[in-house]
């Protein structure tokens, strides 16, 4: 029971889970059970946000005739060697609203969030596919991570 004024969550896979033995990484975090497309085996780490596609702004790939971009953003700070830390903690304040949880109630409150995926590209940093068609573990990934932290906002809370 209680009155909640906000929520805090992390985008990414925390460092403790990232360095735990593979046998302890179950469900969607098990790289051998369908989660391999969101895991870097070469870097022993998870991809937090993945975007791939084509853009008129990306450089031309002559063999394919396409203009591809590939963004695989991860890194949690490193296990034995320091790396970038692209884990992002997001705090959503409910403002003047309160989510009231009561044992006697048959329904739980709901916080409705908006996810503006475009913010990944045009948040505090405008992403330029011309200059950065491929982003993975390089320093530029921190710009993308700072952008995805900004993509989630509160629409409203209701308690009925």
Task: Name every feature range the model reports, one short phrase each.
Residues 1-160:
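A short, solvent-exposed, low-complexity linear motif enriched for acidic/polar residues
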């Amino acid at each position: 029971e209680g009155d909640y004024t906000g929520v805090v969550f992390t985008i990414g896979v925390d460092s403790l889970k990232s360095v735990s033995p593979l046998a302890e990484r179950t469900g969607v975090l098990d790289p051998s059970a369908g989660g391999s497309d969101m895991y870097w085996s070469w870097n022993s780490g998870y991809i937090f946000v993945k975007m791939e596609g084509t853009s008129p702004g990306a450089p031309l790939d002559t063999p394919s005739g396409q203009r591809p971009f590939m963004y695989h953003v991860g890194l949690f700070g490193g296990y034995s060697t320091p790396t970038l830390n692209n884990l992002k903690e997001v705090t959503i304040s409910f403002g003047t609203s309160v989510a009231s949880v009561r044992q006697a109630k048959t329904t739980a409150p709901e916080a409705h969030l908006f996810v503006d995926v475009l913010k990944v590209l045009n948040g505090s940093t405008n992403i330029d596919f011309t200059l950065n068609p491929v982003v993975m573990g390089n320093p530029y990934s921190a710009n993308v991570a700072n952008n995805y932290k900004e993509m989630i906002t509160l629409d409203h809370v209701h308690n009925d």
